């Protein structure tokens, strides 16, 4: 391993020698100021520019660490490697103006060779990219080279992974990208704080883009949190990424204040729905299980957020009828809340959870509160968290319409909570609102307390001086969760607050029906189960990074000429015969059932170390445990039956 490491280390030092004349500053022509690159930005840029045969690199850096500025620096100075480049940048459409166009315009005078493609826009992909592809394909010769930059590459990669063994619509474009990126002396730069979001298939597609045909990892290669053929895979990937993660803990782990990043503390709020909301939740559960989209848990997630009285589960209603019903219900709820304005005495009692113990509260306040709680235990808890926050609050609610942001805002009005909304419905005003929210005079939230944001604000947007963030609805993976939380914890995002206020409390509101069912808990478990294997891949990328190699061979003599990356790119890792790898697991026979189907009794074998249940060597379920980490079970007909979730 170390022989190949040292050769790559020699090439890294070769690149550093070759690019030592490059400045570590970049001039902003609009403000006439100079920005000094961070050491890691300068280092990665010089390696990528200095090595002709290192045609691909992943910037695996935390949110807020300057990936965009680094890419712009590379665009500006890559002419040191070759004078004429076509720059093709893949981004989300919402990030075109800020940060991309604003940053490029500030630092690069001639942008005529730069073209943008929106990978979340069908028209941009199908028409614009295909036209560009044809023109680039015909013009790639000794006069031009191509640099492809992909921002938030995980978003693009996830569109190329097969679903149910069927090709995704994006797959043909993915193949064209591979062809362009690996044509002679072209280069590709990918960027993401979370390059893998769901599974190992995404990792294989990412590597297929950066170094096609060199390897294929299978999920069974990962056992007990370790990659069985780690050495072979790492050697195949040496130098494939630059790694900068100041905080390596995942989104569900507390972190301390470090190097300009606010302290993070996790809080789980387990709350019980009203009887009315529980009733609708059970109806939604039956509806979800009957529909093709039941796996998305759609209706349960909607009802967990808000359940207005007499609200009908969609059932046989078509989309027009259902939407009309939703509009009527929202109008009714709006009319009901117009006259609710809680007294200061009630709000103080509510903040301190003293409503039941206070005897002098207005009966109208109590009645109105009970009705609001009946519709949404989540929104009530969110209001309590906000009122107890010392500063500004972010609230993530991906549901933009009736069951989400639209109804949530009425709750805020009742409790006199000031807010702005950053979502797909506020495109015209949201940037101005965000500027007011981030304004220095609002650092403590005295003017605007809350910013409600949906997926429209979960990437590429920065919020300043946030003290609390509330997650009302769980995303599907830790990557999205990291992006959401990353909006509030960025480099120096809290620098204008006193040191003791440089923290972010992350609140997860987990609602349970009165029979203890929770789609929020299901989603949280999915996130945790996915992340285990993804963390193995992240450790692999760290071990393969240019920083890890350089730290081991910092003072080694550089090579005279490039050779190694041309060889690595053309060497395929041998397939591993997993049947030859003997893994000893101690398993115990067990009787169990799934939590959502307690009528079906199953038999399997339990690994007590991991709580995973196997059937013919395949993991099929995982024990549900209580707060003391003890398994939950029932006894029927003198048989001990363990309660489990699906193994994801």
Curated annotation (Swiss-Prot):
Q: Which residues bind ATP?
A: 61-68
Please explain the role this protein plays, according to its UniProt record.
Answer: DNA-dependent ATPase required for providing the needed energy to achieve the termination of early transcripts. Acts in concert with the RAP94 subunit of the virion RNA polymerase and the capping enzyme/VTF to catalyze release of UUUUUNU-containing nascent RNA from the elongation complex. NPH-I must bind ssDNA in order to exhibit ATPase activity.
For this chain, one GO molecular function annotation is: ATP binding
Please state the span of the N-terminal signal peptide per the UniProt entry: none
The similarity comment for this entry is: Belongs to the helicase family. NPH I subfamily.
Position of sequence motif DEXH box: 151-154
Q: Which UniProt keywords apply?
A: ATP-binding, DNA-binding, Hydrolase, Nucleotide-binding, Transcription, Virion
Q: Which GO terms describe its cellular component?
A: virion component
Major location (coarse): virion
State its location(s): Virion
Instruction: Give the catalytic activity.
Output: a ribonucleoside 5'-triphosphate + H2O = a ribonucleoside 5'-diphosphate + phosphate + H(+)
The species is: Choristoneura biennis entomopoxvirus
Q: Does the keyword Oxidoreductase apply?
A: no
Database matches in SMART domains:
DEXDc, HELICc
> What are its GO biological-process terms?
DNA-templated transcription
Region annotation (Binding to the cap-specific mRNA (nucleoside-2'-O-)-methyltransferase) maps to 468-534
On subunit structure and binding partners, the annotation says: Monomer. Interacts (via C-terminus) with RAP94 (via N-terminus). Interacts with the cap-specific mRNA (nucleoside-2'-O-)-methyltransferase.
What are the Helicase ATP-binding domain coordinates in residue numbering? Answer: 48-213
Occurrences of domain Helicase C-terminal (ranges): 379-542
Q: What is this protein called?
A: Nucleoside triphosphatase I
EC number(s) given by UniProt: 3.6.1.15
